[in-house]
Swiss-Prot record:
Function: DNA-binding transcription regulator that regulates endothelial cell proliferation and G1/S cell-cycle progression. Specifically binds the 5'-[AT]NTNN[GT]GGCA[AGT]-3' core DNA sequence and acts by modulating expression of pRB-E2F cell-cycle target genes, including RRM1. Component of a THAP1/THAP3-HCFC1-OGT complex that is required for the regulation of the transcriptional activity of RRM1. May also have pro-apoptotic activity by potentiating both serum-withdrawal and TNF-induced apoptosis.
Quaternary structure note: Interacts with PAWR. Component of a THAP1/THAP3-HCFC1-OGT complex that contains, either THAP1 or THAP3, HCFC1 and OGT. Interacts with OGT. Interacts (via the HBM) with HCFC1 (via the Kelch-repeat domain); the interaction recruits HCFC1 to the RRM1 promoter.
Motif stretch (HCFC1-binding motif (HBM)): 133-136
A Gene Ontology molecular function term of the record: DNA-binding transcription factor activity
Location relative to the cell: Nucleus, Nucleoplasm; Nucleus, PML body
Biological process, per Gene Ontology: DNA-templated transcription; endothelial cell proliferation; regulation of DNA-templated transcription; regulation of mitotic cell cycle; regulation of transcription by RNA polymerase II
Protein name: THAP domain-containing protein 1
Entries under InterPro entries matching the protein: THAP1/10 (IPR026516), THAP_Znf (IPR006612), THAP_Znf_sf (IPR038441)
The organism's taxonomic lineage, starting at the top: Eukaryota, Metazoa, Chordata, Craniata, Vertebrata
UniProt xrefs under PROSITE patterns: ZF_THAP
Length: 212
């Protein structure tokens, strides 16, 4: 069976006398095979074990030089296609962008003929939606302000508690210093007692007058 090239518009067929080599689709490597299918760009084309692409659709760097440009590299993909299969006109037409609806005319104030007063414009659905959105925004802002006020109060309470704790720590430090002084004084007193000093009364010594 003569082996044709699967590329659209390519008329090459296998001929051992021509320097054109044919390379089958890598069906055993699905990801690489999908790249080949995408490169061919043929609608509803599914390669089979007989489908192949001729060497004219590959760039020179896709071939192994040591094999005389007859074997493809592992990740080679065909990229040279002079002809592509035409698509349907419906597919070629790009979807037109949908234009936004024209803006609604501004509401016109009405005059009540019975009382001669200028009446406010009727609330259209657009106006109602804007009004509702504005209400939601105001409510969210008020809620956020209330929450911020609550957080500020909590911070103030924590600041007061911290100040009280710091004062308590300073008092305890002063008490500790006093206790250290008392202990030091008591140790000094005990050391004096151990040395055996005797405190004599003031009238123990007599004053002797020495004649001149």
């Amino acid at each position: 069976m003569v082996q044709p090239c699967s590329a659209y518009g390519c008329k090459n067929r296998y001929d051992k006398d021509k320097p054109v080599s044919f390379h089958k689709f890598p069906l055993t490597r699905p990801s690489l095979c999908k790249e080949w299918e995408a490169a061919v760009r043929r609608k509803n084309f599914k390669p089979t074990k007989y489908s192949s692409i001729c060497s004219e659709h590959f760039t020179p760097d896709c071939f192994k030089r040591e094999c005389n440009n007859k074997l493809l590299k592992e990740n080679a993909v065909p990229t040279i296609f002079l002809c592509t299969e035409p698509h349907d006109k419906k597919e070629d037409l790009e979807p037109q962008e949908q234009l936004p609806p024209p803006p609604l005319p501004p509401p016109v104030s009405q005059v009540d003929a019975a009382i001669g007063l200028l009446m406010p414009p009727l609330q259209t659905p657009v106006n109602l939606s804007v009004f509702c959105d504005h209400n939601y925004t105001v409510e969210d802002t008020m809620h956020q302000r209330k929450r911020i006020h609550q957080l500020e109060q909590q911070v103030e309470k924590l600041r007061k508690k911290l100040k009280t704790a710091q004062q308590r720590c300073r008092r305890q430090e002063r008490q500790l210093e006093k206790l250290k002084e008392v202990v030091h004084f008591q140790k000094e007193k005990d050391n004096v007692s151990e040395r055996g000093y005797v405190i004599l009364p003031n009238d123990y010594f007599e004053i002797v007058e020495v004649p001149a």
